[in-house]
């Protein structure tokens, strides 16, 4: 299966039990900032934005004072799991980023999708990739 198929079939799919509800954008990005696959709607990000995200995984709390920036959009960093997940909120939407051994799994949502639904979609793929040694 191609990386694009993982994004299309596992991240941009309908939310279980909520037909028609899906993430706004999603991507799988290498730790070096290289895009492995992304939805057509995933924002073009700057290298320094990805560097900030990777720094926060290695030094939890790094993004809290300034917020998480992705594609020029600023998200307020909310609770996460140090070194494992970063969550951000902006208005009625937000972002979840999970880290595997080699990649970041990113999901962006807007209402009616809830933060919990976004977390579930992103974490399900992240768990699978971890099981595969990725």
UniProtKB/Swiss-Prot annotation:
Q: Could you state a single Gene Ontology molecular function term?
A: actin monomer binding
The UniProt entry annotates the motif Involved in PIP2 interaction at 84-100
Modification after translation, per record: Phosphorylated by MAP kinases.
Which InterPro entries does the UniProt entry name for this protein?
PFN, PFN_euk, PFN_sf, Profilin_CS
**Cross-referenced Gene3D superfamilies, in alphabetical order?**
Dynein light chain 2a, cytoplasmic (3.30.450.30)
Q: Which residues are connected by disulfide bridges in this protein?
A: 13-118
Q: Name one GO cellular component term.
A: cell cortex
Highest taxon listed in the record's lineage: Eukaryota
* Phosphothreonine carried by residues: 114
Its predominant location is cytoplasm
Sorted alphabetically, which SMART domains does this protein's record hold?
PROF (SM00392)
The record, for Pfam families, names: Profilin (PF00235)
Where does the protein end up?
Cytoplasm, Cytoskeleton
- Is Disulfide bond there in the keyword field? yes
Q: CDD domains in the record, alphabetically?
A: PROF
Which segment of the chain is annotated as a signal peptide?
none
Keywords from UniProt, A to Z, are:
Actin-binding, Allergen, Cytoplasm, Cytoskeleton, Disulfide bond, Phosphoprotein
Its quaternary organisation is: Occurs in many kinds of cells as a complex with monomeric actin in a 1:1 ratio.
Q: Which family does it belong to?
A: Belongs to the profilin family.
Additional note from the record:
The variability of the residues taking part of IgE-binding epitopes might be responsible of the difference in cross-reactivity among olive pollen cultivars, and between distantly related pollen species, leading to a variable range of allergy reactions among atopic patients.
Function field? Binds to actin and affects the structure of the cytoskeleton. At high concentrations, profilin prevents the polymerization of actin, whereas it enhances it at low concentrations.
Protein's name in the database: Profilin-1
The organism named in the record is Olea europaea
């Amino acid at each position: 299966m191609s990386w694009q198929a993982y994004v299309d079939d596992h991240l941009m799919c309908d939310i279980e039990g909520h037909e028609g509800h899906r993430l706004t954008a999603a991507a799988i990005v290498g730790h070096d900032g290289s895009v492995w696959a992304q939805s057509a709607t995933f924002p073009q990000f700057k290298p320094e934005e990805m560097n900030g995200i990777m720094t926060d995984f290695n030094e939890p709390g790094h993004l809290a004072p300034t917020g998480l920036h992705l594609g020029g959009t600023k998200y307020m960093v909310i609770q996460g799991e140090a070194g494992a997940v970063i969550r951000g909120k902006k208005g009625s939407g937000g972002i979840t980023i999970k880290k595997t051994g080699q990649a970041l799994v990113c999901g962006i949502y807007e209402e009616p999708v809830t933060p919990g639904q976004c977390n579930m979609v992103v974490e399900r793929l992240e768990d699978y990739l971890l099981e595969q040694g990725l």
